[in-house]
């Protein structure tokens, strides 16, 4: 989910 994207940020 978007959780992974937020981790990269």
From Swiss-Prot:
Source superkingdom: Eukaryota
GO molecular function: toxin activity
GO cellular component: extracellular region
Tissue specificity comment: Expressed by the venom gland.
Compartment list: Secreted
Keywords: Secreted, Toxin
Keyword flag 4Fe-4S: no
Similarity-based family: Belongs to the cationic peptide 04 (cupiennin) family. 08 subfamily.
Protein name: Short cationic peptide-4e
